[in-house]
Amino acid sequence: MNDLIINHIAELILPRSTDKPLKGKELDELNVVKNGTVVIKDGKIVYAGTHTDDYDATETIDASGKVVSPALVDAHTHLTFGGSREHEMSLKRQGKSYLEILEMGGGILSTVNATRETSEDDLFKKAEHDLLTMIKHGVLAVESKSGYGLDRENELKQLKVSNRLAEKYDLDMKHTFLGPHAVPKEASSNEAFLEEMIALLPEVKQYADFADIFCETGVFTIEQSQHYMQKAKEAGFKVKIHADEIDPLGGLELAIDEQAISADHLVASSDKGKEKLRNSDTVAVLLPATTFYLGKEDYADARGMLDNNGAIALATDYNPGSSVTNNLQLVMAIAALKLKLSPNEVWNAVTVNAAKAIDINAGTINTGDKANLVIWDAPNHEYIPYHFGINHAEKVIKDGKVIVDNTVSFKA
């Protein structure tokens, strides 16, 4: 006897199972089954396809008028941080620049100070709350970066917190050491600080899957970023890079040359970099909520990347300064509106390709897969990026069990 059948599904979203990320035109290929059925036993998918009465189960969910998809994958978050920076919104409205806010004690270094001052247990409680919000919105696989400690003690603290979260909730969670995220005030130079972070690589390896660096004007150069990435690979890490967010320094090209698993942001990437994606499996992780939140007009050139047969994914970039959202559904809407992605491209970019960007087996619904699913209160898959700003996730299913039920009942 099977454990659960979900039947009469209006639309069942079945992204293609693939060893490599979907590239170029492949991103627009999505198998959407009308009147679908999913059968689950022992936390795994037994059957997913057109409606059938050939299976029995101890529990049945009628998904008439609903959409069912793989659980979403958020491939770029800064989940563990102390404090918040809501007061900076009014300063920005007054015309204060980022550097002026930084000089006033705000900006990233204020988050560094808050993170350093927050105990590991308190940091865990805060990150747990934010993670549960993500789960309620349909995410069951997450990448979590450090980068607000900027010293040995606090970088380790952030990574330990994300590892504790993964263990407590048994999530598909990957952890990224982003020690070179900024340069702390106490550092004698960018170069000296980078060497401190490189020296930490062997110690943080037990807590982190990836090593990341912020390659940008005023932070770390192309040459410094390459040095760090090579040292990280020698220490056994797969590498990522925050690249070309503000200036076209060539971070995308570097990511491809160093065979990074992903390059993230890429708002200012050059045509040369986009062309190099053609022969690479490096995933371009685009973060349109960041551009939106910062009030900028120029978004990453998703269409140009796809036209060059590149692989792209979408993520929230959840952080306290430039993308204060842990709702990946909102990112889906912004991507459709501002990156000009089709609904099919959006869905693939937050499932199978996002999974490739963090090297996990997720984002598909195939026989033998973990039964990590979302039942959406929506008539079709195009509706979710169309109707933005609310939570469409009705039920979140992890390993075949309903762990979130957002159904709301009102009493007159």
From Swiss-Prot:
Name of this protein: Imidazolonepropionase
GO biological process, one term: L-histidine catabolic process
Binding site for N-formimidoyl-L-glutamate: Y148, N319, G321
The reaction(s) this protein catalyses: 4-imidazolone-5-propanoate + H2O = N-formimidoyl-L-glutamate
EC category name: hydrolase
InterPro entries in UniProt: Amidohydro-rel, HutI, Metal-dep_hydrolase_composite, Metal_Hydrolase
GO molecular function: imidazolonepropionase activity; iron ion binding; zinc ion binding
Species the sequence originates in: Staphylococcus aureus (strain NCTC 8325 / PS 47)
PANTHER family for this protein: IMIDAZOLONEPROPIONASE, IMIDAZOLONEPROPIONASE-RELATED
Pathway: Amino-acid degradation; L-histidine degradation into L-glutamate; N-formimidoyl-L-glutamate from L-histidine: step 3/3
Cofactor-binding details, from the entry: Binds 1 zinc or iron ion per subunit.
A GO term from the CC aspect: cytoplasm
Pfam families named among the record's database cross-references: Amidohydro_1
UniProt keywords, alphabetically: Cytoplasm, Histidine metabolism, Hydrolase, Iron, Metal-binding, Zinc
CDD domains (UniProt xref): Imidazolone-5PH (cd01296)
Lineage, opening ranks: Bacteria, Bacillati, Bacillota, Bacilli, Bacillales
Binding residue positions for 4-imidazolone-5-propanoate: R85, Y148, H181, E245, S322
Binding site for Fe(3+): H76, H78, H242, D317
Residue ranges that the Swiss-Prot or TrEMBL entry lists as coiled coil: none
EC numbers, comma separated: 3.5.2.7
Chain's role: Catalyzes the hydrolytic cleavage of the carbon-nitrogen bond in imidazolone-5-propanoate to yield N-formimidoyl-L-glutamate. It is the third step in the universal histidine degradation pathway.
